[in-house]
């Protein structure tokens, strides 16, 4: 049986075109995942999700047995990711889950926390 060479229809190494995905979309999702990819931050978010009122940073330090600078570091990451808001009351800072989270983020959190 003779071996026949098949004609090349596509360029070598290119099977099909990828669907268009905006780089900014991927960067935003990756930043969100980075913020969520820590057990302490997930615990903080779960506490804020279940709370009826803002929570003082001092309550997190006592409840999680971590130092205030460590909790502040985690809160900064969550704030940068757009997940929490804060307000200063005297010498303490109180945190709450951001009211206007994107629907997709809220759904993701509800699945992670519920």
Regions found by a protein language model. Give the residues of each.
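Amphipathic alpha-helical interaction surfaces in cytosolic regulatory modules
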Residues: 38, 73-75, 80-81
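Short hydrophobic/aromatic patches at helix-to-coil boundaries
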Residues: 110-114
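Base-recognition residues in the alpha-helical recognition helix of bacterial helix-turn-helix
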Residues: 46, 72-76, 91
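N-terminal leader segment of winged-helix/HTH proteins
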Residues: 1-36, 109
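N-terminal helix-turn-helix DNA-binding core of bacterial DNA-binding proteins
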Residues: 27-67, 93-100
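Beta-hairpin "wing" of winged helix-turn-helix
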Residues: 79-89, 96
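Short, charged/polar, Gly/Pro-enriched secondary-structure boundary elements
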Residues: 100-106
